[in-house]
Amino acid sequence: SRLLLTLATGTGKTSVAFQICWKLWTTRWNRAGEPRRPKILFLADRNFLVDDPMAKDFAPFGDARHKIESGEVVQGRDMYFAIYQAMAEDERRAGLFRKYPRDFFDLVVVDECHRGSARADSAWRDILNHFEPAAQLGMTATPLREDSRDTYLYFGNPLYTYSLQQGIADGFLAPYRVHRVITEWDAAGWRPSKDELDRYGRAIPDDEYQTKDFERVVALRARTEAIA
């Protein structure tokens, strides 16, 4: 019940996700084989990755759409959208995902699934584990490499891969040249000072942060501005 699609950035992952959800919804497919429409969750790690598809690609779902946020539990819709952070458990609250039965969703679409949800030690993984009875479709633009190995261990080998090279050859993507820039933070790493707080007043865990952590675990305003 775990499936993976790998499509290069810009080749239509969101459109493919919509078509899959739409066809399952209109044909009234569900895991139990009951005479009803499926319950589907579209899960991502940033609001714009949820809000934009919900408003545009998934517009044909109309009033069947609902975004899970602010602790509100709605169970009367069919097409749900959420970011991990809204559903996950943290030191301030129990996970909102626990308020939904384990078998509530028939399909969970995990957009940009390489961003950490498949890591065994990730709090986001708890969401996928909770909804384990559902079919889980991971979507990513990241081919198998060391920092995405957990994704492939969890979802398995891709059912279908549409590579960057294919996208360029087919005329959907423009050719490119890489210009690599190394900032001082990437070269030397970064460690917070003792008792340093983030912009929200929360303590930053004392650790050595490297390139792989930036924009995933921590975001440094000075680094972001330098790159921009």
What are these regions (language model features)?
Residues 2-20:
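Walker A/P-loop
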Residues 6-8, 38-46:
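Conserved RecA-like ASCE P-loop NTPase motor core of nucleic-acid helicases/translocases
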Residues 31-36, 47-71:
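Conserved helix-turn-beta segment of the N-terminal RecA-like "Helicase ATP-binding" lobe
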Residues 49, 86, 114-115, 144-145:
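Residues immediately C-terminal
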Residues 57-93:
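Inter-Walker segment of RecA-like/P-loop motor cores
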Residues 80-83, 135-140:
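Structural recognition of the conserved hydrophobic beta-strand(s) that form the central parallel beta-sheet
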Residues 98-138:
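SF2 helicase catalytic motif II
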Residues 149-228:
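Interdomain helical connector at the RecA1-RecA2 junction of SF1/SF2 helicase-like NTPases
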